[in-house]
């Protein structure tokens, strides 16, 4: 199925989603990669607030290229999500609702997604220019010294995504190949 969602996201918004469903996401999405995640953990360890509201938030693992004239952002393809696995359960426990990236996640992240009623969505890898078409605005909100890894506030419209991990334990990296093999077997 395809769903149309608006941030901030609630558990009720995410509960119907199943691995393999598609989503058109609109609203505010924050960008953060490895270095930004490390700094967020430092803030939390010091008892300080995060630089953006985490409750119901969506984080996109991306380091966009500089924007071209007349564009809000340059190419904005996803980075490998596994690099954020060490930080993710803590953010999910604080209310992070959605992560956007590519690639498999650790068992700890999968369990935390289920425990927190969250989702992990895939952006189209290798199609950064296509993904950028959905970005209406982009502003660096903290840590500009990180360059492309600075935390940005994106406003997106109909951002095309696929559910990889759902709130019920569904995992497209497991169910997808199994469905393919079953379909292939039925043809022979």
Regions found by a protein language model. Name each.
Residues 1-9:
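Short, structured beta-strand/loop micro-motifs enriched in basic residues and often containing a Trp
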Residues 9, 29, 64-66, 158, ...:
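A broadly conserved detector of short glycine/acidic/proline-rich loop/turn motifs that flank catalytic sites
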Residues 25, 133-188:
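C-terminal binding/interaction regions
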Residues 31-159:
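Feature captures the catalytic cores and cofactor-binding loops of soluble hydro-lyases/lyases
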